[in-house]
Swiss-Prot record:
Biological function: May play a role in RNA metabolism in both nuclei and mitochondria. In the nucleus binds to HNRPA1-associated poly(A) mRNAs and is part of nmRNP complexes at late stages of mRNA maturation which are possibly associated with nuclear mRNA export. Positively modulates nuclear export of mRNAs containing the EIF4E sensitivity element (4ESE) by binding simultaneously to both EIF4E and the 4ESE and acting as a platform for assembly for the RNA export complex. Also binds to exportin XPO1/CRM1 to engage the nuclear pore and traffic the bound mRNAs to the cytoplasm.
The keyword Heme belongs to this UniProt entry's keyword annotation: no
Lineage, opening ranks: Eukaryota, Metazoa, Chordata, Craniata, Vertebrata
Listed GO CC annotations: condensed nuclear chromosome; cytoplasm; cytoskeleton; microtubule; mitochondrial nucleoid; mitochondrion; nuclear inner membrane; nuclear outer membrane
Annotated gene: Lrpprc
Tissue-wise expression: Strongly expressed in heart, liver and kidney. Weakly expressed in brain, skeletal muscle and testes.
PPR repeat residue intervals: 125-159, 160-194, 195-229, 230-264, 265-299, 300-334, 402-436, 437-471, 677-708, 709-745, 746-783, 784-820, 821-856, 953-987, 1030-1064, 1065-1101, 1102-1136, 1137-1175, 1176-1210, 1315-1349
Protein name (database record): Leucine-rich PPR motif-containing protein, mitochondrial
């Protein structure tokens, strides 16, 4: 073995990239790391602080904006699907540090359904089957990986060496036993050549089982192929010898490493640590830890977590506490710890997992209401014994880490249908005095109800009785009665099993059940004898069903009269008239038109009996009933219902070309004849100016001074400025002022005067011109501000300090330009040009103090670093850190060191604990390097940011390849490709195409499948005669106007070209059409489109223009045209925007066009890139059906989707808010009533509370407070949907004039006032509406309750009080709103 390793010295020297990813540092099975296979680092280096699992970094890639070039449909679709999958997995990893099996399964199924998955998608899925699945056993993970491999291979994915390497990595992470020789044979059979990464992982596979002989064979292969032996190999051999029982040789590996020229790093020591931990040798572990502490190396939290796993897995949990004491628990390491906890529990080491959990710290400002929830949920999934899980819950609560641990566990148990666990937890909660509510049992009852399991129902009722919970009406009606033949048999069964309570709840449930079955006589008897208050609204839906199933009109009338006149049933608002009116409306609305027609006579009789009983209904409800009767084609009944209207409460309710000599002769002749010369004089002056004949122009002006006008002076001033004639320019300006003090020159002439006067040190005159611009409100455009910059920069380059300072001060003070970083550059430049670095730094700092900008700080720092000005560097960094934060300071210093070639110092900066990627800043430096061809600096940036947390590695290498392409350096590009593989980077398709282009240009083989991009030039071939130079300029002018958003000017150019029969490119027409559509110039856009289609073969609009066209067609109600546009765009494989498709669907719904909506649904099926939620179709199809009076069909479809066992949409995402809102806005009362019934049924029968909560919130938002209150009374569980209510409050608080809505919500659900998110939203809304009184009341209420108020809440309240001139009763938080928003967001996102 030593003989194989000693020659590694020269191999290592030849290695282009000796490092391996950090992901190769974990022992097998631990989340995020492999078995003792260690990352190679430079001597003394450590991974950047803040990094997570390396696999997590695979997904931390910022979604790219698509290239401007249009991609063909197959490529674009494949790429967009990859981005979608990446986004889903990335979000999960960012949020939790792991991936769930369900999410990975959904992404896998979506990938397969695309029909043409790509190699990148395969790589992404395979790499997700390892340690990112801590909630799955090792065998399940590997089985999943094999399933993905086989399925994608069937679908035609071509695997390359990166896929085999990914599979190897999964095997190692999952401790999968396999034959490395068979694996190599499999690769050979697929004609895939192994690379260095393959051999390194095969060595790790042998070493994991202690097979040193096998590892030696692979080392031999590597030697013959001249592959470098990296530290990862040495570290694997440490593990191999240890697992072979040879600890002496394991430790000797460190000596061999030194002989090979490598100083063992912390990764190698970590491998040795794990080896001793697996043997339970705590003494050796302590010695290694002590040795590393005394060296330049250090261990990170995640390293200690590996050691904990090694001890636990080997059966030595007694040493875990000692290792836990060494962990610092930095924020970035929390996800690693959480994943270790989950995996320990999965491996039946839940006690150790709980020990680690208890050691985790609470994040800053954490509310202690969800700490450890992830662990408890996983324990429920693993079906741990109830007594153990309850013990965990109590220990968490006693440690004040999770205030509602038992409640949360109960929630998980009910969701997972763990009856025994749920019962045990409920009993524990009851013992502690926590109220157990009936709806907690509904998920358990629902399963038995579906199978008509009477004994199961009885068992659950017994459990309810045992834990002291009385079933409510909904429980009986929805879950108990349906399992029996009659109410009597229910009563008998409950009595027999001693489950019938003495309260009236069961009797009231019986009444509802009788109503449902049409037994009206029993209902009447009950209502007459009832002594308890009973709400009419709670009976309404049931009575409607009862009335329809019984045709005894006398009973109809008697029940209605009783409910109308008896105060027990209509004592609450809105009163008896409204209650009966809505009941009649809903009764008729519940019937079909044929049913109403068949029962016309009985309804007439019913109305007349009500009249005799003196029952009244309001006028507005009467009108609604009339509309219904007209719709049902029974207008004859209107006169019969009219007699019920309460009349006492009725209320009712957009020159030809000439030479200068000719003009001068004409001018003299006119003067001699005594005729006006103004026009000719102006024409002559303009001509001389155009000829740049300043001397002659000034002579003409002097000769005819008495005849001069403002326009002539303006032209002369501009001419003198162009000729750098400050004296005459200033004199002419003074003459203009004497002639007409109110005259205003155009902006360009003022700017020209400032420039020439400043250049000639006439600062006061220049400042006076600036003051005049301000006084006369001269138009300041972006081009004007740019001109100011050039004036200042010119003075700076000339070294004119005072000129720069005074002109800048005047420009900014007068408000002619904002004090931006760009306009302030010259203040620093003037000192840099003079080499005065202290003054340059002071100028930059002064700008920040005065204007909050820090111009040219990078250039100043670079100069200071070059000169070695340590004191000034420290001063600069202290200032930046104080004003812009430590992270900004670190990046400034990092870039300065990179720019100046101080790479060791740059490395130290980027490895600072806690630093994380800032994509915008990194891209800024990349662009700077590319623009100035700084290859070495960019290469070092890419190298040093390898371990930077959340760094988009593909983006970094893409920038590097762009630079290599400029220099045609294919060798470096190829080396970059090797490094990308070693880092396990999943390249985007654009990166692969760029690399392939570099290699092909240099006649090199491309080692991967190149994603194809088909595109053609549809520019019409025009002969030279038809495209003159002048016409080309016209096209450029048109595009220039488009860029400036000048739609009218651009369209006029098009008209001119059209007359001349000049044809532009299709891109130009698409751009013009898009601009016209954005300006809502629909007719003109269609004109351009028609012309392009008739003159360019195959002309089509691009995605963006077609999307705009659809939106404009919808706005004009051209729905058929919009549908045709959408179909054409999809046929061209374009991807229309989400808003365009959504607006078309919504417009079709309001027209009741179900067929067209379903056609769109078929058209966009599989196009996940549009981002259309399935709820868009569900909501709008239902709305369209309701518009067609097909209410029952709409309700049935929604109910089926909600209650189906194979739900396409998870219940928590099944949002019906849009449907409810439109039904309320369109005043579709029958539909609203049926939706209300359906929503309540879903809540009562299936414990699905989102629909009824959405309805409640829409009623509140639309001002229907009474209806909302009644709904809340019927379904009290709405008040417990805290997450939905919080989201509603957040969205509402962002809209003006919505404070009353939030007030109403808090009145209906008072307990929300103590929710920190809700009261923060309330204050935000009050501040937005300037509602000081409400804000004061809220503040006083919260302070009286001694609730902790965050700084953002206090900042908003203080700002509101200051706006109205009232004193602030507390010290105002000093930072900006943005600061506190970010602070609060980070606090809430902190994992617990």
């Amino acid at each position: 073995m030593a003989a194989l390793l000693r020659p590694a010295r020269w191999l290592l020297g030849a290695a282009a990239a000796p490092r391996l990813p950090l992901s190769l540092r974990l022992p097998a099975g631990v989340p995020g790391r492999l078995s003792s296979v260690v990352r190679v680092a430079a001597v003394g280096s450590r991974p950047a602080a803040g990094e997570r699992l390396s696999q997590a970094r695979l997904y931390a890639i910022v979604a790219e904006k698509r290239d401007l070039q249009e991609e063909p449909a197959p490529v674009r679709k494949n790429s967009s699907q990859f981005d979608w999958a990446l986004m889903r997995l990335d979000n999960s990893v960012r949020r939790t540090g792991r991936i769930t099996k369900g999410l990975l399964q959904r992404v896998f199924e979506s990938t397969c359904s695309s029909g043409s998955p790509g190699s990148n998608q395969a790589l992404l899925l395979l790499r997700s089957c390892g340690s990112l699945l801590p909630e799955l056993s090792l065998a399940e993970r590997t089985e999943f990986a094999h399933k993905i491999w086989d399925k994608l291979q069937q679908l035609g994915v071509v695997y390359d060496v990166s896929h085999y390497n990914a599979l190897l990595k999964v095997y190692l992470q999952n401790e999968y036993k396999f034959s490395p020789t068979d694996f190599l044979a499999k690769m050979e059979g697929a004609n895939i050549q192994p690379n260095r990464v393959t051999y390194q992982r095969l060595i790790a596979a042998y070493c994991n089982v202690g097979d040193i002989e096998g590892a030696s064979k692979i080392l031999g292969f590597m030697k013959t192929k001249d592959l470098p032996i990296t530290e990862a190999v040495f570290s694997a051999l440490v593990t191999g010898h240890a697992r072979a029982g040879d600890m002496e040789n394991a430790e000797n590996i460190l000596t061999v490493m030194k002989q090979a020229g490598i100083e063992p790093g912390p990764d190698t020591y970590l491998a040795l640590l794990n080896a001793h931990a697996e043997r339970g040798d705590i003494g050796q572990v302590r010695q290694i830890l002590e040795k590393v502490e005394k060296s330049d190396h250090y261990f990170m939290d995640r390293d200690f977590l590996q050691v904990i796993f090694s001890f636990s897995k080997a059966g030595y949990p007694q040493y875990v506490s000692e290792i836990l004491e060494k962990i610092t628990y930095e924020r970035r390491s929390i996800p690693d710890a959480m994943n270790l906890i989950l995996f320990l529990a999965t491996e039946k080491l839940e006690d150790t997992a709980f020990q680690v959990l208890l050691a985790l710290p609470l994040s800053k400002d954490e509310s202690s209401d969800n700490f450890g929830s992830f662990f408890l949920r996983h324990c429920v999934t693993l079906d741990l014994p109830p007594e153990k899980l309850i013990d965990y819950c109590r220990r968490l609560r006693d440690a004040k880490l999770h205030s509602s641990s038992l409640q949360f566990t109960l929630h998980c148990a009910l969701q997972a249908n763990r009856t025994a666990l749920a019962k045990a937890v409920m009993e524990a909660l009851r013992e502690e005095g926590f109220p157990i509510r009936p709806h907690y049992f509904w998920p358990l009852l629902a399963g038995h109800q579906k199978t008509k399991n009477v004994q199961g129902i009885i068992d659950i009722l017994k459990i309810m009785n045992k834990v002291g919970v009385d079933p409510d009406q909904e429980t009986y009606i929805n879950y108990v009665f349906p399992c029996f033949d009659s109410a009597q048999s229910v009563r008998a069964a409950l009595q027999e099993n001693e489950c019938l309570l003495a309260s009236s709840t069961f009797a009231q449930a019986e009444v509802k059940n009788e109503a449902i079955n049409g037994n009206l006589q029993n209902i009447l008897s009950f209502l007459e004898s009832n002594t308890l208050p009973f709400s009419f609204s709670s009976l309404r839906n049931s009575l409607i069903l009862g009335f329809r199933r019984s045709m005894n009109i006398d009973l109809w009338s008697k029940i209605t009269e009783l409910l109308y006149k008896d105060e027990r049933y209509c004592s609450k608002p809105p009163g008896p008239a409204e209650a009966v009116g809505y009941f009649l409306y809903n009764l008729i609305d519940s019937m079909s038109d044929s049913e109403v027609q068949a029962k016309e006579e009985r309804l007439r009789q019913y109305f007349h009996q009500l009249q005799e009983m003196n029952v009244k209904v309001p006028e507005n409800i009467y009108k609604g009933i009339c509309n219904l009767l007209n719709t049902y084609h029974v207008p004859e009944l209107i006169k019969d219902i009219k007699v019920l209207v309460d009349r006492e409460k009725v209320d009712s309710q957009k020159t030809s070309q000439v030479t200068s000599s000719d003009l001068e002769s004409t001018l003299e002749k006119l003067k001699a004849e005594g005729q006006p010369v103004g026009s000719a004089l102006k024409q002559l002056l303009l001509l001389l100016c155009s000829e740049e004949n300043m001397q002659k122009a000034l002579e003409v002006k002097a000769k005819y001074e008495s005849d001069m006008v403002i326009g002539g002076y303006a032209a002369l001033i501009n001419l003198c400025c162009r000729h750098d004639n400050a004296e005459d320019a200033w004199n002419l300006k003074q003459e203009v002022d004497r002639l007409d003090a109110s005259a205003i020159l155009d902006t360009a002439k003022y700017v020209a005067l400032v420039k020439v006067l400043g250049k000639h040190s006439r600062l006061q005159d220049a400042i006076n011109i600036l003051k005049e611009m301000k006084e006369k409100d001269v138009v300041i455009k972006d081009a004007t501000v740019l001109s100011f910059f050039h004036i200042l920069n010119g003075a700076a380059l000339r070294g004119e300090i005072e000129t720069v300072k005074q002109l800048h001060e005047a420009i900014v003070t007068l408000g002619l330009a904002k004090p931006s970083s760009n306009i302030s550059f010259p203040l620093v430049t003037v000192h840099l040009e003079k080499g005065d670095l202290p003054a340059a730094l002071e100028a930059s700092i002064a700008c920040h103090k005065k204007y909050k900008v820090l111009p040219r700080i990078h250039d100043v720092l670079c100069k200071l670093v070059e000169k070695g000005e340590t004191d000034l560097i420290q001063k600069a960094m202290d200032f930046v850190s104080q004003e812009q934060g430590e992270m900004t300071m670190l990046y400034d210093l990092f870039f300065a060191f990179l720019q100046t070639g101080n790479y060791k110092e740059a490395k130290k900066i980027i490895e600072t604990p806690g630093i994380r990627a800032r994509p915008t800043r990194l891209q800024w430096f990349c662009d700077r390097c590319i623009a100035s061809n700084q290859v070495e600096a960019l290469e070092k940036l890419v190298e040093l940011t390898e371990k930077l947390f959340e760094c988009d590695r593909d983006q970094m290498y893409y920038n590097l390849l762009k630079l290599y392409k400029i220099s045609s350096d294919w060798q470096r590009a190829d080396a970059a490709w090797t490094k990308m593989q070693e880092e396990n980077i999943i390249p985007r398709e654009r990166t692969l195409r760029l690399l392939a282009e570099i290699l092909k240009t240099s006649n090199q083989e491309v080692p991967f499948d190149v994603p194809e991009l088909w595109f053609g030039d549809d520019r019409p071939s025009l002969s030279p005669s038809s495209r003159s130079a002048g016409e080309d300029v016209t096209e450029k002018t048109l595009l220039s106007n488009c860029k400036l958003k000048k739609s009218k000017d651009a369209y006029n150019i098009f008209l001119k070209a059209e007359k001349q029969n000049v044809v532009f490119s299709s891109e130009t027409y698409s751009t013009l059409i898009g601009l016209l559509l954005s300006k809502d110039d629909f007719t003109q856009a269609m004109h351009v489109k028609d012309f392009a289609e008739t003159h360019i073969k195959g002309f089509t609009l691009n995605d963006a223009a077609n999307s705009l066209l659809i939106i404009r067609q919808v706005r004009r109600d051209y729905l058929k045209g919009a549908l045709a546009t959408l179909r054409a765009a999809l046929d061209l494989k374009q991807v229309p925007s989400q808003i365009a498709v959504t607006r078309l669907i919504q417009a079709l719904a309001l027209k009741g066009d179900v067929e067209s909506i379903e056609a769109i649904q078929r058209m966009v099926a599989g196009l996940d890139t549009i981002g259309l939620s399935k709820m868009v179709f569900i909501n709008n199809i239902a709305l369209a059906q309701m518009k067609n009076n097909k209410l029952d069909a709409a309700i049935e479809n929604i109910e089926h989707l909600l209650a189906s066992e194979n739900q396409a949409i998870e219940p928590q995402y099944f949002g019906l808010s849009y449907l409810f809102r439109k039904v309320i806005e369109e005043q579709m009362e029958p539909a609203l009533e049926k939706l209300s019934i359906m929503s309540e049924r879903m809540a009562n029968q299936f414990a699905l509370y989102k629909p009824v909560t959405d309805l409640f919130l829409q009623l509140v938002d639309s001002g229907k407070v009474d209806e909302a209150r009644a709904l809340l009374e019927r379904c009290g569980a709405i008040a417990e949907q805290s997450s939905l209510l919080s989201v509603f409050c957040l969205r509402t608080s962002q809209k003006p004039k919505k404070a009353p809505v939030l007030k109403t919500l808090l009145e209906l659900i008072p307990e929300l006032r103590d929710n920190d998110k809700v009261y923060s939203c309330s204050m935000k809304s009050y501040a937005l509406d300037k509602d000081v009184a409400s804000a004061k009341a809220l503040y006083e209420y919260l302070t009286a309750k001694n609730l902790k108020l965050d700084d953002l809440f206090l900042k908003r309240y203080a700002a509101l009080l200051k706006d109205v001139g009232e004193p602030v009763p507390f010290p105002e938080p000093p930072e900006s709103f943005a600061f506190y928003i970010k602070q609060l967001k980070e606090a809430r996102e902190s994992p617990s």
